[in-house]
A protein has these predicted regions:
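Transmembrane alpha-helices and adjacent helix-loop boundaries
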Residues: 1-315
C-alpha cells in the first residue's frame, strides 16, 4: 500500500516538474499553445481511460461529451448571459446527466454492439450541433467569450499553459487516487470478467454507469477548457474523428495506465507538428508510425517500456 502511494506521488511530482520546466526549454507562444493542447487532450484521455482501460467498456462517441462542454461555454454567455466559469459547471453537469440517461440502456450492451451504440450517441450530438445553427452557429461554429475570474480576464497562451497544466495535474491526481478506492477496484474487476465481478457481489450495472459518468465529466471539462482557450468552437470537436483520436490516445499510451493516457496524447498531438516538414507525406508517416508502434508495443507505449525496464532492472 505504501509503495503504491509513493508511486502515485512520484508520478504527480514528475508531471508537475515537466509542466514547470517545459517553459524554460521552449519559451515561445507556439510551444505554449501546443503544450496546452496536449494537456487538455491528456485530461480528456485520462477520463476515457477510466471507462475503457479500467472498467473495460468501449466508447466511440465520447467526443459528444467534449462538444457539450465546449458549446456550453459558448452558448451560455452568448444566449443566456451565464458567466463562462458557471457555464463550465453547467456543461459538466449536463454531460453527467446525459451520460447517466444514455448509459443506463446502452451499457447493457457489450463489445461491438456497445461501440456502435456509443457511436450513435456521438453522431447524434454532432448532428444537433450542426443543424441547430440559431444556437450553435451551425457548421461555421461560434465565438467563445473570454473567461473572467475574480475580475481578471484570462488570456494569452502562457496563461492558458499554466491553467491547463494545473488542470491536468489535478485530473491525474484524481484518477490515480481512484485506482485505490473500492470503486477503482470494482472497475478493474469488471475489466477482468463481468461474470466473476457479479459472482463477487459487485453491482455491475452501477459501476459501469459510474465509469461512463466519470469519463463524460472529464471530457466535458476538457471541451470547455479548449473552447475558452481557442476563443472559438466548431462541430468538429464533437465529431467522430475526434472520438477516434481520443480512443487512439488511450490505446497508444496503454489501456489502464494513467501515465499512458498522457503519453498517448503527447505523441498524437506533437507528432503531426514534427512531421509537417515532410509536407504531403505527413499523414502517411503519422499512420505508419502508429501502426509500427502498435505492432511492436501491443500493450501500449508505457506498459511496454515499463516491462522492458523491469526486465533490465532484474537482470
Amino acid at each position: 500500500m505504501l509503495q503504491r502511494i509513493g508511486h502515485r506521488y512520484l508520478i504527480l511530482i514528475a508531471l508537475a516538474a515537466v509542466v514547470a520546466v517545459l517553459p524554460l526549454i521552449f519559451p515561445s507562444s507556439y510551444y505554449f499553445r501546443v503544450a496546452s493542447l496536449v494537456w487538455v487532450s491528456a485530461f480528456a484521455a485520462i477520463g476515457l481511460n477510466v471507462l475503457m482501460g479500467q472498467a473495460g467498456q468501449v466508447s466511440l462517441g465520447h467526443a459528444g461529451f467534449f462538444g457539450i462542454g465546449a458549446y456550453a461555454v459558448a452558448i451560455g454567455p452568448a444566449h443566456f448571459g451565464v458567466p463562462p466559469w458557471a457555464a463550465i459547471i453547467i456543461g459538466c453537469a449536463l454531460s453527467c446527466v446525459l451520460a447517466y440517461l444514455v448509459g443506463r440502456p446502452i451499457l447493457k450492451l457489450k463489445g461491438h454492439y456497445l461501440a456502435i451504440a456509443t457511436l450513435g450517441f456521438g453522431v447524434l450530438v454532432a448532428l444537433v450541433i450542426t443543424t441547430e445553427s440559431r444556437w450553435t452557429g451551425g457548421p461555421d461554429g461560434m465565438p467563445v467569450a473570454k473567461l473572467v475570474l475574480f475580475g481578471w480576464r484570462v488570456s494569452g497562451s502562457d496563461t492558458w499553459y499554466w491553467i491547463t497544466g494545473g488542470l491536468l495535474v489535478l485530473g491525474t491526481w484524481l484518477a490515480l487516487n481512484l485506482n485505490d478506492t473500492p470503486t477503482g477496484r470494482a472497475f478493474r474487476a469488471l475489466h477482468d470478467s463481468e461474470v466473476a465481478a457479479r459472482v463477487a457481489g459487485i453491482d455491475v450495472a452501477r459501476f459501469k454507469l459510474q465509469a461512463f459518468v466519470i469519463a463524460a465529466a472529464y471530457a466535458s471539462i476538457a471541451g470547455s477548457a479548449l473552447a475558452l482557450m481557442n476563443g472559438f468552437i466548431n462541430p468538429d470537436q464533437a465529431g467522430f474523428l475526434h472520438s477516434v483520436e481520443m480512443v487512439t490516445m488511450v490505446v497508444l499510451g496503454g489501456l489502464g495506465s494513467v501515465v499512458g493516457s498522457i503519453v498517448g496524447a503527447a505523441v498524437l498531438i506533437t507528432l503531426p507538428q514534427i512531421l509537417t516538414v515532410f509536407q504531403e507525406y505527413e499523414h502517411l508517416l503519422l499512420g505508419f508510425i502508429i501502426i509500427v508502434s502498435m505492432i511492436f508495443m501491443r500493450d501500449g507505449i508505457v506498459p511496454t517500456l515499463s516491462r522492458l525496464l523491469a526486465k533490465r532492472t532484474q537482470a
